[in-house]
Structure formats: structure tokens, C-alpha cells
Amino acid sequence: MKVLLLEDVKNLGKAGEVCEVKDGYGNNFLIANQKAKLATNEVINKYKAEVKKKAEKEALEKAQKLQMVETLQTITLTIHKKVGANGSLFGAITKEEITERLKEQHASLNLDKKDIELKHPIKSTGIYEIEVKLGFGVVGTFKIDVVAE
């Protein structure tokens, strides 16, 4: 019996491979546990189409992320905060505040706070470079200018 593996199976093969197995193993374990499907031409073609569609979708998402990084690199986000006598801020600037200000000043950029990498909260005025990880190995930076109110 030939089956198309839907996921990696130890000692048999990887997802997407067509394997020859005994009828009992194929029906009672692989197909019953949805680890494989009976390998007909229709099933194989459908699986290949799904894989191709998924790859195209990922390529499109990666291109959008790369375009977002290019836009981010041109941005300097200005944040006005109250400052004490020694130049330190009252409170700190966190990921949440950065994403809120980005949405206010640049509505086209849709970043989530989990995308922003802050090693520590910003507690004083100055210009800071913020790293953004958008997935698919896409990493970018933008600048934040913290000024006294």
C-alpha cells in the first residue's frame, strides 16, 4: 500500500514523501492517526498544490515584512516625556508606548509590541536605536528621539 505522509514518521520518512507500507500499518496506524493518506494521484496533486500555495503566501508575507523594514529605517519617532532635574524621565518608555506612538505617527505601520526588541526600558532623554524582529528572519531598526516636554 502506498501512502502520502502528512507529517514526519520515525523510521519511515518525512512529510510529503510517498512510502510503501504494509496494509495493516497503513490503515490501522498511519491513516487512523491522520499521519498519512492513501497515495492516489488526486491526493498527491492536492498536497503539492497546498504546499505551493503555502510557499507563495510565505513569500508574499516576507516581501511585505522587508518593505516594512525599509520604511522603518527612514523613521525617527519623537516621544515627548516629562523629565526630572537630572535628565531622567518620570517613568520609562516601554514597548507598549513605542507601538502606540508608532501607530499615532505612522498609521500604515502595524507593529505589535512583541516585534520590538528592547534590552531595557528607556529612562533618559536622547536618541535610541530600536531593533524590530518581524519573523521570517527579517530584522530592522528605527530611531526614537526622546525629548523633554
Swiss-Prot record:
Record key words, sorted: Ribonucleoprotein, Ribosomal protein, RNA-binding, rRNA-binding
SUPFAM superfamilies named among the record's database cross-references: L9 N-domain-like, Ribosomal protein L9 C-domain
Pfam families: Ribosomal_L9_C (PF03948), Ribosomal_L9_N (PF01281)
Ribonucleoprotein found in the keyword field: yes
Record GO terms (molecular function): rRNA binding; structural constituent of ribosome
GO cellular component: ribonucleoprotein complex; ribosome
Top-level taxon of origin: Bacteria
Example GO BP: translation
The keyword Repressor is assigned to this record: no
InterPro entries membership: Ribosomal_bL9, Ribosomal_bL9/RNase_H1_N, Ribosomal_bL9_bac/chp, Ribosomal_bL9_C, Ribosomal_bL9_C_sf, Ribosomal_bL9_N, Ribosomal_bL9_N_sf
Family the entry assigns: Belongs to the bacterial ribosomal protein bL9 family.
HAMAP family assigned: Ribosomal_bL9
Cited function: Binds to the 23S rRNA.
The protein's name in its UniProt record: Large ribosomal subunit protein bL9
Origin species: Helicobacter pylori (strain G27)
Lineage: Bacteria, Pseudomonadati, Campylobacterota, Epsilonproteobacteria, Campylobacterales
Gene name in the database record: rplI
